[in-house]
Regions:
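Loop/turn elements at helix/coil->beta-strand transitions in domains of secreted/extracellular proteins
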Residues: 60-64, 90-95, 122-127, 156-157, ...
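Thiol-/selenol-based redox modules, centered on thioredoxin-like
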Residues: 141-144, 148-192
Length: 192
């Protein structure tokens, strides 16, 4: 008797599952993910690491704050404010990406030293990339496009606010500190 009841229960469960499951063609279509702009679809090596990151794959559809950085610059203390910005807004989707660069001859010649400046001295937890060019004909593909849409960095710690669709919203120069109301207003505008 128990065997018959068990068999009937199994049959009912299977039949119920078959009627509840809709055919794949009837399933609602999810919205297509936003296409990532080609200029962000590149592999970059992380600072003082062998690991690489593709900005599109890692951060597609998220607003970005992209900054060219250097570890021996008068603006280097901005790392602290950039980290505070990242901590404050990451819950709202903001991603901060620092591109170390020696284009203005102020980056440490040793990547370990540059990493210590960022990670140990300033407690940076946002993505930092290995030194590369951010201006001129040798600029990496990200900065080629940022420079095209706005302006090339005139110094270290230029900040580029990039919408989730890849369009550059605003370029802020080195003198605009992460703690300033101008900067905060720009970030808030990006996240609307």
């Amino acid at each position: 008797m128990r065997a018959v009841i068990s068999a009937l229960l199994i049959t009912v469960v299977i039949a119920s599952a078959a009627t509840v499951t809709a055919p794949a063609s009837a399933a609602p279509q999810a919205a297509a993910p936003q296409a990532c702009p080609a200029y962000l679809d590149h592999e970059f090596r992380k600072l003082h690491s062998s690991q690489t990151i593709n900005i599109c794959k890692a951060f597609a559809g998220k607003p970005l704050l992209i900054v060219n950085t250097a570890s021996h610059c008068g603006f280097t203390p901005q790392f602290k404010g950039l980290e505070a910005t990242y901590q404050k807004y990451k819950g709202r989707g903001l991603v901060v990406v620092g591109f170390a660069s020696d284009d203005f001859n102020q980056e440490a010649k040793d990547e370990a030293e540059a990493a210590d400046t960022c990670f140990l001295n300033y407690g940076v937890t946002f993505t930092m990339l290995s030194p590369q060019h951010v201006k001129g004909p040798e600029a990496n593909p990200v900065f080629q496009e940022l420079n095209r849409q706005t302006a090339a960095p005139g110094w270290n710690f230029n900040k580029y606010l990039v919408r989730a669709d890849g369009k550059v919203l605003q370029h802020l120069d080195s003198k605009v500190a992460p703690e300033s109301s101008e900067f905060t207003t720009a970030v808030e505008s990006l996240l609307k």
